[in-house]
């Protein structure tokens, strides 16, 4: 068997007829039209001490990361207005900016008051104004909030910059001494905190739909078991204790169920458990490997990876019974499915025919066309922003596991700052407010 479901094989190691398709599917290898130029001018500051965060830089980076906007560098700006009355539109027209944002930060009673305004340069009209207040420690939160408000006003799509991310680090000190940590950070990798630390592997962390719980696989008992942990209190609950593989947990949209993979009856199959009643139901029943479940928004449809056709491809089925339907047809390897928020796009790990590289790709579910988003070689574990505009994934750079962000339109691709050691298994949170 080829290197089937690389992530699953890692778990298995720790634990101990092709379907035809019409050749109408299309492979696209790059993005197209350019992002809209936007200027986020450095915010004015009326206090004495230097602020710990650059608000304008955070807002600018957020808008850039979406793939919709191309920020104009500060050094190229002709003027630096900090309030609406100071904006000279000819300066921004000369730079080709479509939008310009200005802001001002004022200390007030131990807090910071931030006023901001966004303008359409061509029409010279204000399109958004607002204010937000908080403490020094909340500067990043306020910047992400401003970016969220601006993005939604300009695109009609709810911003996802105030969300969080989970990921796992593995720091090796010697042959038999590796420290694994489960981290939570801002979506952009900032402000990471440790939720769990172990000398045994941690895999497949997943946010619950309420953003208050997480599920993950831990080897702390020397074999894989699935746990649910409450983020605020740290309280944990063991969900599975079966022989063999216990892996790949996935939450139902209402948070009442978990789908996961068990090999207790032989080969890996997908099961669903009701977390209240603890009733366990088997979903797949096939001699192949079935893994990496992901719920559709209806709470009944499961997308998953299987080699039942000879090579890893993506299928979907109903948790209440019925056969599996193949979804992916382009390429000789498609795995680790995730859906966009509107369920029109499937994000996956893809390998083209005749190639050995694994890349993040998106498939238009209506047309079947596939677009490759990345240019790296060993991508894995894609996770999608709740608004569907960005993907975070794990890959390797210079021999080290790292996390990368790519916009769904392919315009932006950049590394995320994370801790030392191997970094893997990212998971994007739902909206948190």
From Swiss-Prot:
Database matches in Pfam families: PD40, TolB_N
- Does the keyword Cell division belong to this entry? yes
Localization:
Periplasm
Keyword vocabulary terms for this entry: Cell cycle, Cell division, Periplasm, Signal
Which segment of the chain is annotated as a signal peptide? Answer: 1-21
Coarsely, its chief localization is periplasm
BP GO annotations? cell division; protein import
- Gene Ontology, cellular component aspect: periplasmic space
PANTHER family named among the record's database cross-references: PROTEIN TOLB, PROTEIN TOLB HOMOLOG
State the oligomer form and interacting partners.
The Tol-Pal system is composed of five core proteins: the inner membrane proteins TolA, TolQ and TolR, the periplasmic protein TolB and the outer membrane protein Pal. They form a network linking the inner and outer membranes and the peptidoglycan layer.
* Function according to Swiss-Prot or TrEMBL: Part of the Tol-Pal system, which plays a role in outer membrane invagination during cell division and is important for maintaining outer membrane integrity.
Q: NCBIfam families under this entry?
A: propeller_TolB
Q: Which family does it belong to?
A: Belongs to the TolB family.
Name this protein carries in UniProt: Tol-Pal system protein TolB
């Amino acid at each position: 068997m080829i290197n089937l479901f690389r992530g699953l094989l890692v778990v298995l190691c720790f634990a101990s007829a092709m379907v035809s398709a019409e050749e109408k599917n299309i492979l696209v290898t790059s993005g197209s039209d350019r992002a809209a130029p936007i200027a986020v001018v450095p915010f004015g500051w009326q206090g004495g001490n230097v602020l710990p965060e650059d608000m304008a830089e955070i807002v600018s980076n957020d808008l850039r990361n979406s793939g919709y906007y191309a920020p104009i560098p500060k050094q190229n700006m002709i003027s630096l207005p900090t309030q609406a009355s100071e904006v000279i539109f000819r300066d921004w027209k000369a730079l080709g900016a479509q939008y310009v944002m200005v802001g001002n930060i004022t200390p007030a009673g131990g807090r910071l008051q931030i006023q901001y305004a966004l303008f359409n340069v061509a029409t010279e009209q204000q399109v958004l104004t607002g204010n937000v207040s908080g403490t020094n420690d909340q500067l990043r939160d306020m910047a992400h909030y401003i970016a969220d408000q601006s993005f939604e006003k300009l695109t009609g799509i709810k911003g996802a910059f105030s969300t969080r991310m989970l990921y796992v680090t593995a720091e090796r000190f010697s042959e038999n001494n590796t420290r694994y940590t489960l981290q939570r950070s801002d979506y952009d990798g900032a402000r990471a905190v440790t939720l769990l630390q172990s000398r045994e592997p941690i895999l497949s962390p997943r946010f619950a739909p309420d953003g208050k719980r997480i599920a993950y696989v831990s080897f702390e008992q020397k074999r894989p078991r699935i746990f649910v942990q409450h983020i605020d209190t740290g309280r944990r609950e063991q969900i599975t204790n079966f022989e063999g593989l216990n892996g790949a947990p996935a939450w139902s949209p209402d948070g009442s169920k978990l789908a996961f993979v068990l090999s207790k009856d032989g080969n890996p199959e997908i099961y669903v458990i009701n977390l209240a009643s603890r009733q366990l139901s088997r979903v797949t029943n096939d001699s192949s490997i079935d893994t990496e479940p992901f719920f559709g928004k209806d709470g009944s449809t499961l997308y998953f990876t299987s080699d039942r056709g000879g090579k890893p491809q993506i299928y979907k089925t109903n948790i209440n019974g019925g056969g599996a339907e193949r979804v992916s047809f382009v390429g000789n390897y498609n795995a680790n499915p995730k859906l966009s928020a509107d369920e029109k796009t499937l994000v996956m790990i893809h390998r083209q025919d005749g190639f050995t590289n694994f890349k993040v790709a998106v498939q238009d579910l209506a047309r079947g066309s596939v677009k490759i988003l990345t240019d790296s070689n060993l991508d894995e574990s894609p996770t999608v922003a709740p608004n569907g505009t960005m993907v975070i994934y794990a890959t390797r750079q210079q021999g080290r596991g790292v996390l990368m962000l790519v916009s769904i339109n392919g315009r932006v691709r950049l590394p995320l700052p994370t801790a030392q050691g191997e970094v893997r298994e990212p998971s994007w949170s739902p909206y948190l407010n």
